[in-house]
Amino acid sequence: MPTSNTNNYSDAMVTPLILIPGLMCDHSVWSPLLPLLPHQQIQIADHGDSESLVDMAHRLLKNAPPRFDMAGHSMGGRVALEVYRLAPERVRRIALMNTGYLPLADGEAGLKERAGRMQLLAIAQSQGVRTMGTQWVQHMVAPARLKDVVLINAITDMFERKTATVFERQQHALLNRLDASDVLTRIHVPCLVMTGEHDAWADVAQHRAMADLLPAKTEVYVIANAGHMLTMEEPAAVAQVFLNWLN
């Protein structure tokens, strides 16, 4: 698990913050945020060749310090919930961003999700990850940002650093995800719940449903002018919420 923010703060002074990327994402999804969190000891999780969320959680715990804060984006939020399920005593704070908690739905809804994921995988396997990413990203950012060439290229470049095999493994992990409702009801540490105003993948209502399951009353932060990739779209707004949560 690479360290991404070097500073002079010891473990005794600053609890490490582990940032967990989502599907086909890496350090770049968090990079715009890092300069805005200068006093945090930050590590970024790497899912490697894992093909289940539970395995990703075990991998994170194996490389993590004894106590830590963690923030998970998208699939990374689901990994964060599995980390808390496995080792709640090691988690000091948790942030859930642009994510979900329910398993694959039964019936038509589940079949539709599976078909959509398999269609993207087929494109990645037959035409390449970048071609897939170019189509996928159209639903990943706020509509006003679709013409932001720098942003769109940064996202598709990030996707392209992963292979179609990694995409297949991570899609398998998401299609076989556990129901984390029970985990949410047992979270007794400060929890941040956040999504983008225009997130078409993990909308505001889904995050309010998550917040309602938490034992403590929890506000849902909705980042204006952002979609699913809010850390890359509106890093300053995200950082301000993060700093309030961490402090």
Task: Annotate each predicted stretch with a short phrase.
Residues 226-239:
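Catalytic histidine-centered segment of alpha/beta-hydrolase-like enzymes
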Residues 197-200, 225-227:
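Acidic beta-to-alpha connecting loop that harbors the catalytic carboxylate
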Residues 2, 7-59, 69, 73:
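Conserved HGGG/HGGXW glycine-rich cap/lid loop of the alpha/beta-hydrolase fold
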Residues 189, 203-212:
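Short alpha-helix in the alpha/beta-hydrolase fold that links the catalytic acid
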Residues 85-86, 90-127, 131-134:
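Flexible "cap/lid" loop of the alpha/beta hydrolase fold
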Residues 108-109, 127-185:
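Conserved alpha/beta-hydrolase catalytic His-Asp/Glu region
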Residues 72-76, 80:
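Gly/Ala-rich beta-loop-alpha elbow adjacent to hydrolase catalytic centers
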Residues 187, 193-195, 199:
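Short beta-strand/loop motif that positions the catalytic acidic residue
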